[in-house]
């Protein structure tokens, strides 16, 4: 773990915020100047453990992380995916004791931003506080969509909805487009997220390929027919609060 005063780790987060919040130049500079330590971890390592009392929030700088719930028997369920530019647990500023865990799914780099620094910036800049709040609303909206997908969508729609969502999220932080993006997740991890077996995931993927809707090359997902996959998924991006959907 090393200290890092460079603003670069915060740039992707600023891009994410700017999708749905108007920030002044001064506010942007304050966000870029947030201090923190950089932690590099191998895949499948816990970054925050359930029940841990935290004094920081984790920003993903590189890789892919997941928030998870852990049962008393040790079994885990992924409840959120966090890409570059995501704060995994900005809400820990209000509730420091983790009721969840955060794990790296790939080799991952995170920025540990002290809660004290976050408190100072939201005290000094109320508009930044509102941007942070809006950001946590998006996290909750994503979770709500995942829950409805698990309960009410068939396997193909569930898979298609996640792919549509991830394309937009990678586009927001300028790491791809909504049609083409690198998504470093395994079929087993997808199975956990979507409540299916890895065999079922493979069947759905093959079916979408066969229909000419989706192409994959390694970790790169290429949506060949955006309109069709959105129809399959019944996808409406309003829950991601893009700027076009905002009134203020």
Each predicted region: which residue ranges?
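Cyclic nucleotide-binding regulatory domains
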Residues: 45-107
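Phosphate-/nucleic-acid-contacting segments
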Residues: 169-248
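Cyclic nucleotide-binding regulatory module and flanking cytosolic helices
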Residues: 1-43, 87, 92-94
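Polybasic "coupling" helices that flank or enter modular domains
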Residues: 127-195
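ATP/adenylate-binding site constellation spanning eukaryotic-like Ser/Thr protein kinases
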Residues: 62, 84, 107, 115, ...
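Cyclic-nucleotide recognition modules
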Residues: 80-141, 145
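Short aromatic/basic micro-patch
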Residues: 38, 81, 112, 184, ...
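Short loop/turn motifs at secondary-structure junctions and domain boundaries
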Residues: 30-31, 48-51, 175
